UniProtKB/Swiss-Prot annotation:
UniProt catalytic activity: a quinone + NADH + 5 H(+)(in) = a quinol + NAD(+) + 4 H(+)(out)
Species of provenance: Thermomicrobium roseum (strain ATCC 27502 / DSM 5159 / P-2)
Gene Ontology molecular function terms on file: 4 iron, 4 sulfur cluster binding; iron ion binding; NADH dehydrogenase (ubiquinone) activity; NADH:ubiquinone reductase (non-electrogenic) activity; quinone binding
Listed name of the protein: NADH-quinone oxidoreductase subunit B
Biological classification of the source: Bacteria, Pseudomonadati, Thermomicrobiota, Thermomicrobia, Thermomicrobiales
The UniProt record lists the keyword Iron-sulfur: yes
Length: 185
């Protein structure tokens, strides 16, 4: 016979393994920094003692994409760099998440030239867009919090309706975020 929740010890929490893994996945993101321009300086400053993004959110920097589940692309992505971004994204383990940080990564910034990709979402799927030129660390905080909320919704949908429904939700969220950026040249 099993114990009911009322009979169990008050310091013992009963839950499913899936819920525990989902909580750990959103509360302990391992991120791959991909800093390409001035936005990378703000990303680095967000990890310093004043803001301490990594410690506050339980995030760890990873040098290898195989160990990361979050990629933060900060700065201008050139057409020569685009295959490298795609290769690093493909090497990440599933589920993988992407934050596009700054105007250059979001829409190409002021560089409307033949050599610049007009938004990293033309190379890899992006989950969160952090605006600014360069964005302040607080904006990156907000982006990480939004990503954690999306991970919670994704995991709930995956548990309740299956992985296809969760992926459809993710794609709808990406389309909505892309359309909020407005038309591109």
């Amino acid at each position: 016979m099993g114990m009911s929740a009322a009979q169990s010890h008050p310091n013992i929490i009963t839950t499913t393994a899936d819920w525990l893994f989902s909580w750990a996945r959103r509360s302990s993101l391992w991120w791959l920094q991909f800093g390409l321009a001035c936005c990378a300086i703000e990303m680095i400053s967000s990890a310093m003692p004043r803001f301490d993004l990594a410690e506050r959110f339980g995030m760890l920097y990873r040098a290898s994409p195989r160990q990361a589940d979050l990629m933060i692309v900060a700065g201008t992505v050139t057409k020569k760099m685009a295959p490298v971004v795609r290769q690093l994204y493909d090497q990440m383990a599933d589920p993988k998440w992407v934050i596009s940080m700054g105007s250059c990564a979001n829409v190409g910034g002021p560089f409307d030239t033949y050599a610049v990709v007009q938004g990293v979402d033309q190379v890899i799927p992006v989950d969160i867009y952090v605006p600014g030129c360069p964005p302040v660390p607080e904006a990156l905080y907000y982006g990480v919090l939004e990503l954690q909320n999306r991970i919670i919704r994704y995991e709930r949908l995956k548990e309740r309706y299956g992985p296809e429904a969760a992926e459809a939700y993710r794609e709808e969220e990406r389309q909505a975020a892309r359309s909020a950026l407005g038309p591109r040249s």
